[in-house]
Design a protein with these regions (language model features):
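Conserved G1/Walker A P-loop phosphate-binding module
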Residues: 1-111, 127, 140, 144-145
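C-terminal-of-GTPase-core extension/linker across diverse P-loop GTPases
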Residues: 2-6, 11, 17, 139, ...
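Amphipathic alpha-helical transducer elements in NTP-driven molecular machines
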Residues: 32, 46-49, 62-68, 82-96, ...
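Conserved Switch II/interswitch segment of TRAFAC-class P-loop GTPases
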Residues: 40-45, 72-82, 93-154, 169-182, ...
Length: 365
């Protein structure tokens, strides 16, 4: 999974990136400090994997990972190539979802590229640039589909109609992700390289005092929260500066720091949970003396396709999956006891994987 961290210059996105990846991207109080996207790979915390590693004592423990990309700050006109627009748009196209960092604090010492704090305006600026880039691309798709449709190709004619409907929606200043259409048409749009169709998490970046005192009464946060609700997006209240402090601590010091702040989970943990929920992702686990590993799949994935995540041969020669729910395995204390109690099931090719399935795939090629 790849998440693109975007936002206007000086809203805190590089600070947030540093916090969650400890990558040390340069942070400066001026536009375009992040010219090339910084990339960081973050392990997904999973207590289930930790438990299995304790049980099996494998040579290697491999968590699932998320790739974060800190993408250059955007300004008006990016869709026309202004600022770093062209590079910004190509980088965002390669991501699975967008983490849109929105400034929700006043600070006269940190300049805002638009001169004032207004989260709804900031969101609109980036949304509009993505929409304008999509309009240009969709117009080309309409022309291509319409041309193919002249020969009587019904699927091309249908594509052209779908794209025309979306174009009207985009011309109203609305993003592709809010376009109402059938599941079949949605699948077509999701394979069309649209920017504004990508799922969004709004990271509402608060100052330390507001974050500590309670952000529910912050007018800026309320604006972002209400907008996210209207779009079916998610909002994550966060303080990038606090997260950066957490990221600089040793692991055993972090829990104490969080407790002092009255926070149960770090922003990174909450962001990962948000990402999995937004993209409909779950994890299954494999374990043995060589390796214990967590694998990320889309909810609804069947056993053969999950096996293919490990190796294409596993999917091609799939025979069955031997599965036990993690909670059942933990309650039993060992795989041997789980088998004695009949909790290890043999599942076929139509089995839909569940979050936390501890799995052994049987295959033959």
């Amino acid at each position: 999974m790849k998440l693109g961290i975007v936002g206007l210059p000086n809203v805190g996105k590089s600070t947030l990136f540093n916090a969650i990846t400890n990558a040390g991207a340069e942070v400066a109080n001026y536009a375009f400090c992040t010219i090339n996207p910084n990339v960081g790979v973050v392990s997904v915390p999973d207590a289930r994997l930790d438990y299995l590693a304790e049980m099996y004592q494998p040579k290697k423990k491999t968590p699932a990972v998320i790739e974060f990309v800190d993408i250059a700050g955007l300004v008006k006109g990016a869709s026309k190539g202004e600022g770093l627009g062209n590079k910004f748009l190509s980088n965002i196209r390669a991501t699975d979802a967008i983490v849109h960092v929105v400034r929700c604090f006043d600070d006269e010492n940190v300049m805002h590229v638009e001169g004032s704090t207004d989260p709804l305006r900031d969101i609109e600026i980036i949304d509009l640039e993505l929409i304008m880039a999509d309009i240009e691309m969709i117009q080309r798709r309409i022309d291509k589909a319409a041309k193919a449709g002249k020969s009587g190709d019904k699927s091309s004619l249908h594509e052209a109609d779908v794209f025309r409907g979306l174009l009207e929606h985009l011309n109203d200043g609305k993003s592709a992700r809010t376009y109402d259409c059938s599941d079949e048409d949605r699948a077509l749009l999701e394979t069309s390289d649209l920017l504004s169709i990508k799922p969004v998490i709004y990271a509402a970046n608060l100052d330390e005092n507001t974050f500590a005192a309670g952000y529910e009464d912050c007018k800026y946060y309320q604006q972002v929260r209400d907008l996210a609700a209207s779009q079916g997006a998610q909002v994550l209240p966060i303080c990038a500066k606090v997260e950066q402090e957490i990221g600089e601590l040793e692991p055993d010091e972090r829990a104490m720091f969080l407790e002092e702040l009255g926070i149960e989970e770090s922003g990174l943990d909450r962001l990962i949970q948000c990402s999995y929920s937004l993209l409909g992702l779950i994890s299954f686990l494999t374990c043995g003396s060589d390796e214990c590993r967590a694998w990320t799949i889309t909810r609804g994935t069947k056993a053969p396709q999950a096996a293919g995540k490990i190796h294409s041969d596993f999917e091609r020669g799939f025979i069955r999956a031997e599965i036990v729910a993690f909670d059942d395995l933990k309650a039993c204390g060992s795989m041997a006891v789980a088998k004695e109690k009949g909790l290890v099931r043999s599942e076929g090719k139509d089995y839909v994987m569940h979050d936390g399935d501890v799995t052994l795939f049987r295959f033959n090629v």
